[in-house]
């Protein structure tokens, strides 16, 4: 039997997909700008 692959961890999630990580790179800032333009209420994890 294989284990469940999703083992939730908020700290790991924030480190990989968080707002501060997005702000760090130019590409990340572009992602946030695109999500703002689309009207997302949640910009990042």
UniProtKB/Swiss-Prot annotation:
InterPro entries: Ribosomal_bL34, Ribosomal_bL34_CS. The keyword Magnesium does not apply. GO terms for biological process: translation. GO terms for molecular function: structural constituent of ribosome. GO terms for cellular component: ribonucleoprotein complex; ribosome. Keywords: Ribonucleoprotein, Ribosomal protein. Belongs to the bacterial ribosomal protein bL34 family. HAMAP family: Ribosomal_bL34. NCBIfam families: rpmH_bact (TIGR01030). This is Large ribosomal subunit protein bL34. It comes from Clavibacter michiganensis subsp. michiganensis (strain NCPPB 382). The gene is rpmH.
């Amino acid at each position: 039997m294989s284990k469940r692959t999703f083992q939730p961890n908020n700290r790991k999630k924030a480190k990989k997909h968080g707002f501060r990580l997005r702000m760090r790179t130019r590409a990340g800032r572009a992602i946030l700008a695109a999500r703002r333009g689309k009207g997302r209420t949640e910009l990042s994890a």
